[in-house]
Amino acid sequence: GLILCSLPLQGQSRQNISLKFMGLSFHPLSGRPNAKLMPNRLDPEAYFVVDLGALLSYEYFIIPEILSVKGIQGLYADCTAQLAGVTSIGLRARIFRIGRHRLYGGIGPTWIYRRNWYRLPGYVDTKYFEGSPTDKWQRKFLWYGGELEYKYALSPKLDIATTFVPGYPDLMAFAVGLSYNL
């Protein structure tokens, strides 16, 4: 019984690739004390900041449509418009499926890195990122990085996909793009 449940059903893809575009981040407690360093903030306290970039992901379903392993690589211009990135791998599970609508939740180790903000005049270290003033990069490792992903099936092979990263209280991020079932 259990072995049969893990075999792919005809018509169900066991893998997909996604390309999503980032564009908006939200700081629930504001961007203070570094809001003034964020040139693309949409308000004086940097609650909302435009940070353009892309996320490329590969997902393999252990149990088709139910449980998967997903890897994500992203590059973007961070809140100060400097190069930053994210690398993550984790487990994901389907929360619900209703017709063409699906919602997934995922969690796993995540590495976040950015050009060092110490180079920016007026930067105040909030102790969130690791790195000294002489390092080229600042970094953060999270054992528990997570995401929620909503997908709407356009066809059996192609989905519109949106991602929400709930990094409360520091940062919440949004991305939208396409997911292609291989």
Predicted ranges, named:
Residues 24-47, 51, 60-68, 77-182:
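Outer-membrane beta-barrel transmembrane domain signature
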Residues 20-22:
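Short strand-turn segments of transmembrane beta-barrel domains in outer membranes
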Residues 1-18, 182:
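Bacterial Sec-dependent N-terminal signal peptides
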Residues 55-57:
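Short, intrinsically disordered low-complexity segments
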Residues 14-16, 49, 53:
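N-terminal amphipathic/basic helix or basic patch
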